[in-house]
Amino acid sequence: MRFTPLFLLAAVAIASPAPDLNARHELTRRQASESCPIGYCTQNGGTTGGAAGDTVTVTNLADLTEAAESDGPLTIIVSGSISGSAKIRVASDKTIFGESGSSITGIGFYIRRVSNVIMRNLKISKVDADNGDAIGIDASSNVWVDHCDLSGDLSGGKDDLDGLVDISHGAEWITVSNTYFHDHWKGSLIGHSDNNEDEDLGHLHVTYANNYWYNVYSRTPLIRFATVHIINNYWDSLIDTGVNCRMDAQVLIQSSAFHNCPDRAIFFADSDYTGYAVVDDVDLGGSSNSVPEGTLTPSSLPYAAITALGSGQVASVIPGTAGQKL
């Protein structure tokens, strides 16, 4: 039997998806096993998540909850769309990684009094306030949030939903990188109360690197007591306010830009004491910085330098790289 060239091409086209799919699965597993390479989560022995354990794939809320709350190291790959109304209490030594195109709706992740957790390539939306934050990090250490797409719903009341990434109660060695915060009332909070100095002061070391903030009302982020490095962030079309530095926080903001934002890009409000900021190569886009100069400088950071894109480049780069892009 003779096969025409057209038939052979068709056969190749039909056969090719399987190798491509296998390659995609292999890439997902490799990315899900990666350790945090950037910012404060490289400290204190580093952040490896579930790399020392097995890998499982989950497609529903029950299996996701069971895996995330289990003892021992485990990498959890989220496949497809999972929705519900729940707060998942993530245990230590976990990586939760979203496959390309996966999504989680209405489910919050509570990382409380644990260590060594990675939340990566997840698309999380519309978490009701009863289920906490999209990602809440409370009294925990070594947490990496990377390449996540986090959003809410501005059509409801301001308190119907809580924060997208909130970090509190002396949490330590946290990096939030390559993440897309959008369409929400409350972006990200560090330090939950002006009255929590005894627990928070000297802790709350957080890096925000390469993040995109779009159409967020406030808390981008709000910072109390903490030591925070913000680099290569792009804020676009904020609704009310930008970076709120309060209660003796020390903040370093580098290589970042604001566009189409209200006047208060970097500011202090609503506490008895101001925070402080060193602002280096930041395009305020016509907005203002009213925070006193601080003492946190690049040379005082304990981790490897993060390459600065430059304030003139973040607008063209960060929206294309932040979010569920792995």
UniProtKB/Swiss-Prot annotation:
Active-site feature positions: 219
Pathway involvement of the protein, from the record: Glycan metabolism; pectin degradation; 2-dehydro-3-deoxy-D-gluconate from pectin: step 2/5
GO biological process terms held by the UniProt record: cell wall organization; pectin catabolic process
Cleavable signal peptide: 1-15
Cofactors demanded by this protein: Ca(2+)
Alphabetic keyword roster: Calcium, Carbohydrate metabolism, Cell wall biogenesis/degradation, Lyase, Metal-binding, Polysaccharide degradation, Secreted, Signal
Residues the entry annotates as binding Ca(2+): 133, 162, 166
Keyword flag NAD: no
Gene Ontology cellular component list: extracellular region
Main localization category: secreted
Family: Belongs to the polysaccharide lyase 1 family.
Annotated protein name in UniProt: Pectate lyase plyB
